[in-house]
């Protein structure tokens, strides 16, 4: 009887390891779903009274394609394409959908809506794109770079951040 249990131990370990991998893998993907991107964006938009974004598969395909191009070195260079664009880079599980959008939304502290300006020496254009009232569709992608880091690209249709225009 003891021999039978011992002979089944390798199978048990294999199955247990596979299940653990699936749980971890699912957990990582679950933190980077379309809904995760939408929730993070739309919370920021609701805070300033802007209508929610909707997910657009065509915009997401553009984001995926461009993020894949950036994977060689994770160097954040904008595509200058037809969509508005926010990029983020980070390592490991830190760079999730929610974390990327949180980084952009954190720029709100530097944005003065009354004067429609950013504090001197600060960046707030990522935030203003997130809440740009005329941007109604979004698509995002997260890709692992060759250096082990991750790049997140979110694209917005129509684009925002027009000079002299207020985002909301």
Curated annotation (Swiss-Prot):
Coiled coil: none
Induction line: Synthesized during pathogen infection or other stress-related responses.
Top-rank taxon: Eukaryota
GO annotation, biological process: defense response; sexual reproduction
Post-translational modification: Three disulfide bonds are present.
Keyword vocabulary terms for this entry: Disulfide bond, Pathogenesis-related protein, Plant defense, Signal, Vacuole
SCP domain mapped to chain residues: 38-156
Subcellular location: Vacuole
One cellular-component annotation, GO: vacuole
Signal peptide (from-to): 1-30
PANTHER family given in the database record: CYSTEINE-RICH SECRETORY PROTEIN-RELATED (PTHR10334)
Summary of the function given for this chain in its UniProt record: Probably involved in the defense reaction of plants against pathogens.
Family to which the UniProt record says this protein belongs: Belongs to the CRISP family.
Protein name: Pathogenesis-related protein 1A
Taxonomic source organism: Nicotiana tabacum
């Amino acid at each position: 009887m003891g021999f039978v249990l011992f002979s089944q131990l390798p199978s048990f370990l294999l199955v247990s390891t596979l299940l653990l991998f699936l749980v971890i893998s699912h957990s990582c993907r679950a933190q980077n779903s379309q809904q995760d991107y939408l929730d993070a964006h739309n919370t920021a938009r609701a805070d300033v009274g802007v209508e929610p974004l909707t997910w657009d598969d065509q915009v997401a395909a553009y984001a995926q394609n461009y993020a894949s191009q950036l994977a060689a070195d994770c160097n954040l260079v904008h595509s200058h394409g037809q969509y508005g664009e926010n990029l983020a880079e980070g390592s490991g599980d830190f760079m999730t959908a929610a974390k990327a959008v949180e980084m952009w939304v954190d720029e709100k502290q530097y944005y003065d809506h009354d004067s429609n300006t950013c504090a001197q020496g600060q960046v707030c254009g990522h935030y203003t794109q997130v809440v740009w009232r005329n941007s109604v569709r979004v698509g995002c992608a997260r890709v692992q770079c060759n250096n082990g880091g991750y790049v997140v690209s979110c694209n917005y249709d129509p684009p925002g951040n027009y000079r002299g225009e207020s985002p909301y």
